[in-house]
Amino acid sequence: GLVDKVILRSVKYAPCEGCNACHKNGVCIIEDDLIPLFDRILAMDALALASPIYTMGITAEMKGFLDRAQYLWARKYILKTQYFSREHIRGHKGVFISTAGTGWENVFSSAFPIMTAFFDIMCFDYYDNIIANDMDRHRGIRNHPTAIPEAREKGKKVVQVISALKGEG
């Protein structure tokens, strides 16, 4: 399949203004690069969101991106105009990828509910996390003993699951 890689710092977008205009008609009043990006995401079979953990949370760029999906939340939960069947959601997998410098076990804990909410808004099954902490001690991902093999294995697995659901595997 096709892979569409987007680096958020290269995308021109503004944060959500909290104006709630989208609660009336399901349309975001901000016209920038995110609306077409969200349209592309809704058509994807899999979505991997990647953000390092800084100060116990995802990056500001990622949070700003996720918050802009508020208009889709409004469509789903206020206006009830965005609906996908359970079968559709089962066939659309979301994965969170992250690293953290510290070795603390709970370093990713603040990110998980945010990802859960976003994948729900986008009608994706939050399938898995590919996470590795203790990067400072290992001096980067390449020296981490399990990060790359685990990422490859989990990446293959999500592709296999989607292929099987589509009858391709």
Place the predicted regions along the sequence by residue.
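N-terminal beta1-alpha1-beta2 submodule of the flavodoxin-like/Rossmannoid cofactor-binding fold
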Residues: 1-74, 135-169
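Active-site donor-binding loop signature of nucleotide-sugar glycosyltransferases
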Residues: 8, 99, 132
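Short, basic/glycine-rich phosphate-binding loops at helix/coil junctions
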Residues: 16-19, 95-96, 131
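Short, glycine-/small-residue-rich phosphate/pyrophosphate-handling segment
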Residues: 74-127
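Beta-strand-loop-alpha "switch" segments that mediate conformational coupling across diverse proteins
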Residues: 128-134
